[in-house]
Amino acid sequence: MYSASDLRKNLRIKLEGDPYIITEFNFVKPGKGQALYRCKLKNMITGNQFERTFRSVDNFEAADLQEKKMQFLYTEEDRYCFMDNTSYEQIFLTADQVGDAAHFLIDNLEVEILLFEDKPLGISLPNFVDLVVTKADPWAKGDTVSGNTKPVTLQTGYQIMVPPFIEEGEKIRVDTRTGEYLTRVKG
């Protein structure tokens, strides 16, 4: 159980039976009266956002969310299949639930599936993923002098900007939080 003074950004609470995450948080102390907490909340099931003001005497239940390690198996139309490595149970998530994480999903990648009352809500990727460059324009020596970048296509179909010396067939490390190139991966 949380009190209003426990509220902070990224806290997950249960409100009216649904899980919410606090995306913005402001403490307001008026000249007279009790303190107020102005929050922007995002429904973790529907994705809807709204603002709400809470009084300092309000209490909240913690959202009963579990994270489960699972392995990405395959894509079937607009559904993504994941498997629990211990029970071999398979679950499907929609393209909306996976979101932008789809750009970095490769076979057998271990991810965290966020569950609310045993229903999947979304996924958390590892911070870094190694992906193969499937399409890259050739480069000429001297192109690196100006510090330019060039677009490449990765094995998932995602396009990112990389240094000009990256070639087709090479494996690179990508930051899944920003979608940016980090380094070349040897071997």
From Swiss-Prot:
An example GO CC term for this entry is: cytoplasm
A single Pfam family it belongs to is EFP
What are the subcellular locations of this protein? Answer: Cytoplasm
Gene Ontology terms, MF aspect: translation elongation factor activity
Gene Ontology terms: biological process: peptide biosynthetic process
Q: Which UniProt keywords apply?
A: Cytoplasm, Elongation factor, Protein biosynthesis
Query: What domain of life is recorded for the organism?
Result: Bacteria
Cross-referenced Gene3D superfamilies: 2.30.30.30, Nucleic acid-binding proteins (2.40.50.140)
User: Does the keyword Zinc feature in the UniProt annotation?
Assistant: no
Pathway it belongs to?
Protein biosynthesis; polypeptide chain elongation
CDD domains for the chain: S1_EF-P_repeat_1 (cd04470), S1_EF-P_repeat_2 (cd05794)
In which family does this protein belong, per the annotation? Belongs to the elongation factor P family.
Q: What does this protein do?
A: Involved in peptide bond synthesis. Stimulates efficient translation and peptide-bond synthesis on native or reconstituted 70S ribosomes in vitro. Probably functions indirectly by altering the affinity of the ribosome for aminoacyl-tRNA, thus increasing their reactivity as acceptors for peptidyl transferase.
HAMAP family named in the record:
EF_P
Q: What is this protein called?
A: Elongation factor P
Species of the source = Syntrophus aciditrophicus (strain SB)
- Which lineage? Bacteria, Pseudomonadati, Thermodesulfobacteriota, Syntrophia, Syntrophales
Q: Which gene encodes it?
A: efp
